[in-house]
């Protein structure tokens, strides 16, 4: 199979994000990281991330809505994973862990279900930064096992019903994802699309990006994108 060039990936991504507004574009060593405002369910990619709970039950927030969009086959797949893990006295998917499934009715090839810290619980809130890093590392490890994975679509972890502080969370999102795309080892991902529908999170993301743009890995390409220099 012919390998897609980075430019091919960018052109394909422009077709995948028609239902969302591109807010930030940053070029890293291995590809672009974009922040989008819109509905993640309508954004196509190779790998899509679901912000799961530890039961893989899909009963609240974005997790529930994404599972509903994927259909009953996904719920059955999650139930089977939970059943098998409980045989070994394990949670279906603990905090800082990830499992993978087919995408079923969602516009992707595969899904990664990741459990972030639930800041409504003091025992997790007190260690939220470390737990958040663990969650992203679990996500990155899971992505490495999947093909294709050129385009990764994800919500910012912990920012939905789990009530992670948005300003801190926005900074951590960039401080974790940008170095991953800019490190020496190629993750095999050409495009990361961070999709949010939360106005407060987006405003905090814009603020921390403006404040720290010159200190983040990579080069800002937002202005070039808005001028139509690339799609």
Located regions from the model:
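Macrodomain-like recognition of ADP-ribose-binding/processing modules
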Residues: 1-231
